[in-house]
Amino acid sequence: MSRVCELTGKAVLTGNNVSHANNKTKRRFLPNLCQVTLISDALNQRYRLRVSAAALRSVEHRGGLDAFLLKASENELSMRARLLRRQIVKKTAEAAVAA
């Protein structure tokens, strides 16, 4: 399992620890990933995703998983999140036609 957020694409970065004497040693900056279960209102299902804490805040800020995925670009989403986004778009389009 890779260390990449499924919603934002945030991944591991590399850099240096720099001491007071300016000695540099390589290090990795790991994203703060959490396993969370998010509920899709349009599909009435629960989905377990591995997302960063920042992405979780963004999901709540935008008003839920559906709103976040509809506003997000497909480039930064994982393949699983892209499929979920397409299902939500299809379901909301069907609901709009029926109404």
Swiss-Prot record:
Pfam families: Ribosomal_L28. InterPro entries: Ribosomal_bL28, Ribosomal_bL28/bL31-like_sf, Ribosomal_bL28_bact-type, Ribosomal_bL28_sf. Keywords: Ribonucleoprotein, Ribosomal protein. One of its GO terms (biological process) is translation. SUPFAM superfamilies: L28p-like (SSF143800). The keyword Lipid biosynthesis does not apply. GO terms for molecular function: structural constituent of ribosome. GO terms for cellular component: cytosolic large ribosomal subunit. HAMAP family: Ribosomal_bL28 (MF_00373). Belongs to the bacterial ribosomal protein bL28 family. NCBIfam families: L28 (TIGR00009). This is Large ribosomal subunit protein bL28. It comes from Rhizobium etli (strain CIAT 652). The lineage of its organism: Bacteria, Pseudomonadati, Pseudomonadota, Alphaproteobacteria, Hyphomicrobiales.
